[in-house]
């Protein structure tokens, strides 16, 4: 044994496992052991004990001055850990001696399991001091960890003592709570917190905050919900689901219960331990969510009882959410225990647990909104089709009744049966209101008679000689033409502005309902996404199921419309008067354009006033958003339809102008017969054909005014002007024009120019008609001045650069005396005539 103690490592290792008393005794074994342990090894032993107690070792070259405590001071045990928080290797033993003198007596009692009269008399009636002493004893015992047997024995008995102490504290807390001595209970709660018994403190508080079962019993469905949901003025047009009075009464009890517990927590814990937040979270999770689910279930049953879709119970989520926020956040009392951010934390907790319900509401709202819009548009389409079928049946039955009556009265075709060809056009007056111009077969006007005759003539030979078959063919023809006319009149009804406005209102309401939840920060990206989906549904449904089909049908009707066919056929019998049916494709299509433009403007207003201010769409990054692309595609689609429809309309207008030129422009308009003694004097003014053509132009060129943007109007009017110019050119190249008739040609050309320059006012088109006016000079020059005529043809500047010399040559060929003047004209133009060729 003596040999072992001569080895320093063995001596040092043995010393490190000894208790304080044994270590001091081991130093006294012999001088050699003392020499080995003393010095740095001794400082290391005491430093390790202090470190295990929680003190911090600092490095210093000089030994610090130790403030000695009065050994007779009974308060040393309560203050020593506050005084000594650090040490150096040099003073470690001296500092440990101070702790040893304070707590070793307690450690010996615990080691010997002597728990009776454990605390000194001065601490016996002060549980708060006892708590602090117990905490310090536990820390002190860590210094014995090198002697595991001593440490474990003391630790075991300490835990027994501490458990007895905690139980006595809880018992005293209960007794004082029952006697309503909350101040005493608060002191005991503080003892539990100092003892690191937060869980016991929380459980004690929860045991005094149990919710009475009666407060969770919901009112009956009849008391809680409205059978007929009234509108609420302040709710943005949404319906009120709950009986607010009964719902408030029910929730107010829960709110008052929470306020009582907030007050209790403030008394018992003050701001030392935030027990109320944990309690409120448990209340939300265990009570409020259960109540919310029960309300949703009750509402489903209520809907089912009232013959409605029970799956629509999600509709009550917004009202419940904001009511819960109001009752269990806004109307809660301030809490000292929870701190200054109490309300924010409570709202965050409410949002956390209510978030799944809100997400489901937004998802369901988006899905149902799409279904609703689709249903509304489908219903409107069905109504339009039903109405159209009724109108078609009415037209057919009316015509059939007339035909049957005629057939029954006489086997021959009745004298009063007539096929009336009537041309009616609706054109804008100065105030943009439609006016109808009628042309009747009974007119004495020769030109109108000719037009009506030629129009009817194309059909009359198609009728069978068999009387019944003939009447059937007449009926079928009349029905088809009245049907086309009726369809054209109904073009503007293909799009319902009222329905679109209603859908936009519903879109705004749904967007507002979803955006109300924007205070839930974690849901803000999803809220924006759902609002964008609502807007996308609006555009997609309107385009796919309403606007696009309407324009496609309107364009199809325009394509089928032939202004040169019979526009109205009426079968009259006895006293039946003719019906006035108007065919006005461009007018009706223009109104459709106007409606489409209004819809686009409403969508743009909604976008600018709803989506941008609420930052649902970032205007600085909108080019990256598919919503904006969808909106632009919708606008482009309407623009394309408008362009296509207007192009077709212009084609039909040009066809009609061409028809007027062919039918109303009499051969003697520009090539009158030689005057005789009995022939009337003809006024120098535009021909009836020119007047009718300008009337058609006037009725159609200004249809778009106020219906769309100025750029579209300008393009439309310029296109009409240019194509009208081409129609005049083609028409003139087919006419024979005499020197005597040239004066009326010039009148017509001036009349056309006046309309283009002073009414249409499209600067790009005016030069064409300036050049066209000069064409009249080709015919006013007498045949005797044929050389002057040749010079005029060669002077291209006279025609404003509009026509080439070849085109002017074509015009001059329409002179009635061209055969006589041709030689002189060509000689001036080309220098030599054919007869001047010596070879010929």
Curated annotation (Swiss-Prot):
GO BP field: early endosome to Golgi transport; endocytic recycling; endocytosis; exocytosis; Golgi to plasma membrane transport; protein transport
Coiled coil: none
Positions of modified residues (Phosphoserine): 409
CDD domains given in the database record: F-box_SF
One cellular component term from this protein's GO annotations in UniProt: cellular bud neck
Any Pfam family hit: Sec10_HB
F-box domain span: 1-48
Localization per Swiss-Prot or TrEMBL: Cytoplasm; Bud neck; Cell tip
Any GO molecular function: SNARE binding
Keywords per UniProt: Cytoplasm, Phosphoprotein, Protein transport, Transport
Keyword Ubl conjugation in record: no
Transmembrane annotation, as ranges: none
Keyword hit for Cytoplasm: yes
PANTHER family, sorted: RECYCLIN-1, SEC10
Function: Involved in recycling plasma membrane proteins internalized by endocytosis. Required for recycling of the v-SNARE SNC1.
Self-association and partners: Interacts with SKP1.
This protein's name: Recyclin-1
Species of provenance: Saccharomyces cerevisiae (strain ATCC 204508 / S288c)
């Amino acid at each position: 044994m003596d040999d072992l103690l001569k080895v320093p490592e063995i001596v040092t290792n043995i010393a490190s496992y000894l208790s304080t008393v044994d270590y001091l005794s081991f130093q006294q074994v012999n001088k050699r052991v003392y020499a080995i342990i003393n010095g740095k090894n001794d400082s290391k032993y005491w430093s390790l004990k202090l470190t295990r107690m929680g003190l911090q070792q600092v490095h210093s070259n000089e030994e610090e001055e130790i403030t000695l405590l009065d050994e007779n001071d009974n308060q040393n045990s309560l203050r020593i850990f506050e005084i000594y928080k650090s040490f150096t290797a040099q003073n470690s033993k001296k500092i440990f001696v101070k702790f040893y003198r304070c707590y070793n007596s307690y450690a010996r009692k615990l080691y010997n399991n002597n728990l009776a009269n454990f605390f000194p008399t001065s601490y016996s009636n002060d549980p708060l001091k006892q708590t602090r002493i117990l905490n310090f004893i536990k820390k002190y015992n860590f210094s014995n960890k090198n002697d595991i047997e001593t440490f474990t024995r003391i630790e075991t008995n300490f835990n027994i003592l501490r458990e007895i102490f905690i139980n006595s504290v809880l018992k005293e807390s209960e007794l004082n709570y029952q006697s309503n001595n909350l101040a005493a209970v608060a002191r005991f709660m503080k003892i539990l917190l100092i003892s690191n018994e937060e869980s016991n403190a929380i459980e004690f508080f929860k045991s005094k905050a149990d919710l009475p079962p009666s407060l969770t019993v919901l009112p009956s469905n009849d008391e809680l919900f409205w059978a007929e949901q009234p509108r609420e003025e302040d709710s943005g047009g949404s319906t009120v689901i709950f009986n607010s009075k009964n719902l408030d009464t029910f929730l107010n009890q829960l709110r008052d219960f929470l306020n009582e517990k907030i007050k209790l927590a403030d008394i018992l814990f003050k701001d030392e331990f935030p027990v109320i937040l944990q309690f409120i979270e448990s209340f939300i999770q265990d009570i409020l969510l259960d109540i919310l689910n029960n309300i949703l279930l009750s509402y489903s049953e209520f809907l089912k009882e009232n013959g409605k879709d029970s799956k629509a119970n999600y509709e009550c989520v917004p009202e419940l959410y904001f009511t819960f926020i109001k009752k269990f956040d806004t109307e809660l009392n301030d809490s000292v225990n929870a701190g200054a951010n109490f309300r924010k934390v409570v709202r965050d907790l409410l949002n956390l647990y209510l978030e799944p319900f809100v997400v489901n509401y937004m998802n369901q709202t988006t899905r149902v909104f799409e279904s609703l819009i689709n249903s509304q548009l489908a219903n409107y389409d069905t109504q339009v089709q039903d109405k159209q079928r009724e109108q078609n049946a009415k037209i057919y039955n009316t015509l059939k009744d007339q035909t049957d009556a005629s057939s029954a009265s006489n086997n021959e075709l009745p004298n009063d049966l007539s096929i009336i060809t009537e041309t009616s056009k609706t054109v804008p007056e100065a105030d943009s209101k439609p006016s109808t111009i009628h042309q009747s077969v009974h007119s004495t006007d020769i030109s109108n008679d000719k037009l009506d005759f030629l129009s009817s003539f194309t059909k009359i030979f198609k009728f069978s000689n068999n009387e019944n078959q003939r009447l059937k063919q007449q009926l079928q023809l009349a029905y088809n033409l009245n049907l086309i006319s009726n369809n054209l009149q109904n073009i503007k009804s293909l799009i319902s502005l009222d329905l679109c406005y209603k859908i936009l209102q519903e879109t705004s309401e749904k967007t507002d309902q979803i955006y109300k939840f924007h205070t839930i920060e974690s849901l803000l990206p999803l809220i924006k996404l759902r609002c964008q989906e609502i807007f996308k549904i609006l555009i997609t449904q309107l385009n796919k199921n309403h606007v696009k089909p309407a324009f496609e049908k309107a364009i199809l009707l325009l394509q089928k419309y032939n202004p040169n066919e019979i526009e109205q056929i009426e079968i009259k019998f006895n006293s039946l008067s003719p019906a006035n049916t108007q065919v006005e494709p461009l007018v009706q299509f223009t109104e459709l354009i106007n409606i489409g433009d209004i819809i686009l403007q409403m969508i743009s207003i909604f976008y600018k006033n709803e989506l941008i201010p609420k930052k649902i769409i970032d205007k600085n990054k909108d080019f990256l958003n598919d919503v904006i692309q969808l909106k632009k595609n919708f606008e482009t689609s309407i623009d394309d339809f408008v362009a296509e429809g207007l192009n077709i309309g212009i084609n039909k207008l040009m066809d009609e102008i061409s028809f007027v030129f062919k039918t109303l422009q009499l051969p003697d308009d520009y090539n009158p017969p030689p005057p005789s003694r009995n022939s009337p004097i003809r006024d120098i003014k535009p021909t009836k054909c020119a007047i009718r053509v300008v009337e058609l132009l006037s009725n159609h060129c200004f249809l778009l005014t106020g219906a769309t943007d100025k750029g579209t109007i300008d393009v439309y009017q310029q296109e009409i002007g240019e194509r009208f110019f081409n129609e005049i050119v083609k028409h003139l190249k087919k006419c024979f024009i005499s020197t005597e008739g040239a004066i009326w040609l010039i009148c017509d050309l001036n009349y056309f120019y006046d309309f283009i320059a002073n009414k249409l006012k499209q600067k790009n088109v005016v030069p064409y008609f300036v050049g066209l006016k000069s064409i009249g000079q080709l015919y006013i020059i007498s045949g005797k001045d044929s050389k002057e005529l040749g010079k005029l043809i060669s002077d291209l500047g006279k025609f404003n650069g509009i026509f080439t010399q070849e085109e002017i040559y074509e015009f001059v060929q329409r002179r009635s005396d061209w055969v006589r003047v041709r030689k002189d004209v060509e000689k001036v133009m080309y220098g030599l005539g054919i007869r001047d060729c010596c070879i010929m």
